[in-house]
Each structure stands twice: as structure tokens, then as C-alpha cells.
Amino acid sequence: TLGAEQKQWLLDGLYDSRSTWRLIGNPYNANPLKIEDLDTPELRAMNPNLRHNEGIYVSNEGWDDYQVERKEILDFLVEHDIRNVVFSSGHTHVFFASELQPDFDDPASPVAAFDFVTGSLTADPPAEDIAPLEVLRIAQQLLLAQNAPYLKDVNLIDQGYALLDCTPEETIVTFRVIDTFDIDAQPRTYAQFRVARDSRHIERMV
């Protein structure tokens, strides 16, 4: 949670920075994780008093618990045309790649920033001890479907880490996975993304 003083410090830093890339280290995912969208034109026609962005969200201590503050930050970035903002997030123990919009239910809402969330290396048991792999694969597809088009990738199964490489012209994020229960296992790249300087979109490279 950001208090008023902390939030203003963050906004001032983003506004005053002359760096090409503005990186925000973040303990939890900034992207929404909606299980069911309840703010649809059909539902709103039946209930005009429906709250904006109404839905059932995954409760994981992420920014979905602080939607007003998230929107304020993203609106600020759009209002002042502050680009090249990348949230680098962890602690969720899964991989996500997302484009962040002030209003995720409005297709015309501009992309204000990007969120890349890394999996964990040592914090979790084998995925199949949590749920059958087929169930996890279905969950991945459901999350992608419910959070399209801004959620670009989700991996609930593999353990691993992320590499973030910034140059003056682009940021490359590489998701690496490894079987941490196999002593002979080697890491492999399962996904790689590019954000070009001043771009509003993520490009998938792998």
C-alpha cells in the first residue's frame, strides 16, 4: 500500500526522471487478474449502477486490492506522456507479461506501462503437488481469456527466473524455467518479450 507521501514521491520521481527507462521494483503483480468479468455491456444494461471494472479477481495481495491507486498512477503516466515505464515484479511465484492500462475494460484506454512478473526458483513444491497439470493448463487459458488483450502471457506451472536487459532503444525480458527437482536440469528460455523505446505494446519474440 502506498501512503499519500509515498505515492507523491513515486509520481515525482517518474515525472522528474530523465532516464530512458523508468523501472519500478514491485513486490506483487501490477496487472489485473480477473477470474470473471462482471462489467460487460450486457450486465451494465441490466444494472446501470454496476461498479466500474466489476468482477471476481484473484486475491493474492496484488494491485487488484488497490485499484484506485493503480489507476491514479497509470492515469498520471498517460496525462504527462511518461513512457518507458516497466514494473518488475515478483513474489507471486508465477510468470506474467502484461500491458497496463488505466481502464482495463476500455479497449481504447492507452497502454501506460508494462508489468513483467517472474516465477520463483525455490519457494514452491512441484506444480503437480498443487493441482493436476491439466487443471493448471486450463487455468492458464482461462486467465488469458478473461484478461485479454492486456495479459500477454501466464505460466502457472514452471519454476524459474527472469532476465531484464535495458538498452537505449529497447528492453528485453527473458523468462527462464528449470526443473528445480532434477539435479541435472538446465534452464531454458520459454518466453522472451521486447518493448521498444516509446512503444505502447509488448512484442513477443519467443
Name what the model sees in each region.
Residues 1-206:
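Long, structured stretches of catalytic cores involved in phosphate-ester chemistry, encompassing
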